[in-house]
Structures are given as structure tokens and as C-alpha cells.
Design a protein with these regions (language model features):
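Short hydrophobic alpha-helices and adjacent helix-cap/hinge residues
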Residues: 1-110
Length: 110
């Protein structure tokens, strides 16, 4: 099965409506790079939550403002990866999402 992947790219995401229209008209699943794009019509994403990333980055900035030396601070990564599925978008693109995958999803948009 073919699919279209839209990464977290401002140029492409700004034209997401057009990409969704093409994917729907051609019945090609649209997999996206982040949850907001799933809400905008993508079928699914498995990735980070940018709000949580911003919070974590803000906490690190507070440490620096309170005197921590950035050169000695440990590198941090966001461990919380989320599976988000849009069942309406999947249906419009001719995709049947297996129930076991829906059961594993952190968020299902209906």
C-alpha cells in the first residue's frame, strides 16, 4: 500500500489542507509528523508532543537562568512518544485501522 508522509515541516504543514484533499481524492493514507496535523486531517502519527517538548525545554531554561552551566547540563530527550489516530480521516482515505492498533493509541480522534 502506498502512503504519503508529511514530516514536521512548516512549508508542507501550512498547506496541509491541500495535501489532505489530494490524499482523500486518491485514497492514499496520509501519515504525519505530529498530533496537530492528525487533527488537521492526517490519519496517524507516532511522535513527540510539542507542548511537552516546550515545557521540558522551558524547565531547562529555568535551570540556566538560575545559574546552571549549560555546558555541564545533561542532554535531555523527550521520552513520551504518542500514537494518535484519526479514524474519520482514515475512513475518508479508505483505510481500515485494526482494533488492536486503536487500543494501543494514546489518542483516537473520531
Amino acid at each position: 500500500m502506498d502512503a504519503i508522509y508529511v514530516p514536521t515541516d512548516n512549508a508542507v504543514v501550512s498547506a496541509l489542507k491541500s495535501v489532505v484533499q489530494v490524499a482523500e481524492s486518491k485514497q492514499i493514507p496520509l501519515i504525519v509528523g505530529e498530533a496537530n496535523s492528525v487533527k488537521g486531517g492526517g490519519v496517524a502519527t507516532y511522535g513527540i508532543d510539542y507542548e511537552k517538548l516546550g515545557y521540558q525545554t522551558g524547565m531547562m531554561a529555568i535551570e540556566v537562568l538560575e545559574g546552571a552551566d549549560p555546558a555541564t547540563m545533561p542532554i535531555e530527550t523527550l521520552e513520551d512518544i504518542q500514537l494518535v489516530i484519526n479514524t474519520k480521516a482514515a475512513e475518508r482515505m479508505g483505510v481500515e485501522v485494526p482494533q488492536d492498533l486503536l487500543d494501543k493509541a494514546d489518542q483516537v480522534i473520531k
